[in-house]
């Protein structure tokens, strides 16, 4: 079974100013994909996101998906702190998520989310909107098991 963790990057939700809805949606979506899911863990954007990512990697989680903090606001720092945790990026995942979303909502192109690997953990940034989460899940669905298998040392299937 794939072990997943959901981290919500939202300074306002972490302060109790509003109730986040994208985190529970992401948890449910990952469970539908067959994952055992921790979270959602709601943290302020910025360094608390990096700390939560490092904790997930240290805990041996297979995949950690963040929601929020990927926009253009000066407060949106999730991609920057994620980059500092990653060993390497997987640009194709983030590109596919943006392309999928752009088909319905042109502003999906403004998401700065990243995807990559830290240790043996797949890390994916998603937007904080429910639509952005659904788009991310649609893209991750066919990729997740294969990506995790490779990170666990599996071979590429031969076709």
Region annotations inferred by a language model:
Residues 1-159:
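Non-catalytic beta/alpha edge segments that cap or flank active sites
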